[in-house]
């Protein structure tokens, strides 16, 4: 999300039909039913899989890259957690799993030298991981607000990042 001070901020929502990630170098990775695009300059790619039905689409994922391993490892675990779950039970399971994922990912972020984004587990699990949280954390770290983001028109969303989960999908931003 920003190159300032060499810090990489990553946020993406990977679902059954769409998922996006931005990483250091301003290159986009596309997940879900899309292929991975231009994964050659990955510094770190950290995220979580929201879709428990499809999991990680190995046959559609495109070229592998070592930095993708931490994302890939969550899919089977998350998918198993959803077996037999419907309605509110499934939602609760989703939140529980996302909280566990968040803790593992926070540790991975720190190992990569990336600070915590300061989002509580409840907010993470509820899909409220939004741009305002990211920008607030950047400001606390003394990093200027990125200037290359804007809300895109609907036809441009194929080149966008979704910051947030299924409950925050309207917060879509595009790299200029």
Where are these regions (language model features)?
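Phosphate- and other anionic-substrate recognition elements at nucleic-acid/protein interfaces
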Residues: 1-176
């Amino acid at each position: 999300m920003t190159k300032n001070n060499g810090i990489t901020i990553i946020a993406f929502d990977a679902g059954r039909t769409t998922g996006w990630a931005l990483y250091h170098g301003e290159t986009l990775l596309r997940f879900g039913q899309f292929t991975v695009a231009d994964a050659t300059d990955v510094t770190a790619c950290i995220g979580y899989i929201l879709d428990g039905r499809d999991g990680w689409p190995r046959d559609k994922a495109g070229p592998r890259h070592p930095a993708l391993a931490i994302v890939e490892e969550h899919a089977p675990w998350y998918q198993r957690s959803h077996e037999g779950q419907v309605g509110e039970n499934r939602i609760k399971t989703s939140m529980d799993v996302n909280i566990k994922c968040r803790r593992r990912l926070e540790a991975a972020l720190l190992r990569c030298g990336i600070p915590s984004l300061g989002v509580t587990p409840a907010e993470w699990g509820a899909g409220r991981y939004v741009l305002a949280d990211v920008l607030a954390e950047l400001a606390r770290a003394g990093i200027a607000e990125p200037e290359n983001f804007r809300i895109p028109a609907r036809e441009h969303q194929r080149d966008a990042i979704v910051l947030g989960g299924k409950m925050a999908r309207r917060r879509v931003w595009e790299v200029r």
